[in-house]
Amino acid sequence: MNGALDHSDQPDPDAIKTFVGQIPRSWSEKELKELFEPYGAVYQINVLRDRSQNPPQSKGCCFVTFYTRKAALEAQNALHNIKTLPGMHHPIQMKPADSEKSNAVEDRKLFIGMVSKKCNENDIRVMFSPFGQIEECRILRGPDGLSRGCAFVTFSTRAMAQNAIKAMHQSQTMEGCSSPIVVKFADTQKDKEQRRLQQQLAQQMQQLNTATWGNLTGLGGLTPQYLALLQQATSSSNLGAFSGIQQMAGMNALQLQNLATLAAAAAAAQTSATTTNANPLSTTTGALGALTSPVAASTANSTAGAAMNSLTSLGTLQGLAGATVGLNNINALAGMAALNGGLGATGLTNGTAGTMDALTQAYSGIQQYAAAALPTLYSQSLLQQQSAAGSQKEGPEGANLFIYHLPQEFGDQDILQMFMPFGNVISAKVFIDKQTNLSKCFGFVSYDNPVSAQAAIQAMNGFQIGMKRLKVQLKRSKNDSKPY
């Protein structure tokens, strides 16, 4: 038989040559034919053989061509990854041969939407046959057998399908339809995977949103004065400040990790699918946007400050989630810094200085990322807030914080960097002993609004650095006898 079973007549024009792996090396074409013929007439079987051996030995794989495409697809559905042949450890692998991939069905298959429910398959064929040979035409129907108003049409070549799209898409409005006819390439497996990832991301964000608002009930202990300020802050003009609280409440390391993984996958799929329309800004900020507060992400009119807070808060969130249980978990900060190019090989040690270095570099990495994504916005915000270091300017009532248990090494810039993500800092000061010129390990931070101060208290009070836990509370009013 010379390695093949041939017939005088030819297979259908759309017949598929299929590669089959995981077959016994002892099997001949005859045994393989008996395996495949239940699914349809076999045109040809070629067993791949090692010609370096005498006689040539089977490599345990072959090519099979059925007379019809339908038979090949039925065989693949019944055998691929399902049936294990005698003496084999793995199930049969059956897929179109590489030579078939250039003309894959998904490259020639069209989705037709907004089709009149009165149309049948013949009507669709008549409509699209002027553009080339149609291999398959199928109207989607419900369990009741009635048309769902859409169909699939597969042409012999991709060029035919493209011509049909150009001529027919939105060319007419069919009877009983509210919009013009839709003609586009049917979703590929890659498209379906991308959509699945996006749905997972949306679900994750919904869960996070629910958990976040649930945790905001912890603010119920605020005085009526602060509740009024919170209500005022939720107005459109102050939404950026309020989003800081939403970001700080209810997030944990697992949620952040899951969100980051899904967003990166979805962004990569989206970028590869639309390279011609890619925008450097949208591409860079897309993944970050998916991880920011749901409020900030869904508000088109968020202020420049809100956008900046969303970017810078990401680093703090990850750091807070991972670092609150002590030095051994400072790797969370290190990972965030490394992601953004901010961590050197010697950034971590077991001492307090190493902890400070990792923390500082994590913030530095976030700033570098933000600067690359939004250069103008970042530079403006940075200039405004850098001047706050060392200043003792006070904000409005309820916006001034007292922080103690600060590490000895912390200076004005360090405390500024730590509290910037929660809002617009107008002053940040670490108090120094004038005689020793060493830090007294406490300081003050003032915001331009009380909401940011409350967000900072929620996130930073009890935050552990080295062997110390920060204590963050509102600075007492000037009318009180003590500052704290």
Curated annotation (Swiss-Prot):
Swiss-Prot/TrEMBL keywords: Cytoplasm, mRNA processing, Nucleus, Repeat, Repressor, RNA-binding
Entry GO CC: cytoplasm; nucleus; ribonucleoprotein complex
SUPFAM superfamilies linked: RNA-binding domain, RBD
Tissue: Expressed in heart.
Ranges where the record places region Necessary for splicing activity: 188-240
Region (Necessary for nuclear localization and splicing activity) location: 426-484
Region annotation Necessary for nuclear localization: where it falls in the sequence: 347-399
GO molecular function, one term: BRE binding
Annotated stretches, region: Necessary for nuclear export: 1-89, 90-178
Main location: nucleus
One GO biological process term: mRNA splice site recognition
Domain RRM residues, every copy: 16-99, 108-188, 399-477
Compartment(s) of residence: Nucleus; Cytoplasm
SMART domains: RRM
Stated family: Belongs to the CELF/BRUNOL family.
Function field: RNA-binding protein implicated in the regulation of several post-transcriptional events. May be involved in mRNA translation repression and stability. Mediates exon inclusion in TNNT2 pre-mRNA.
Protein name per its UniProtKB record: CUGBP Elav-like family member 2
Gene name in the database record: CELF2
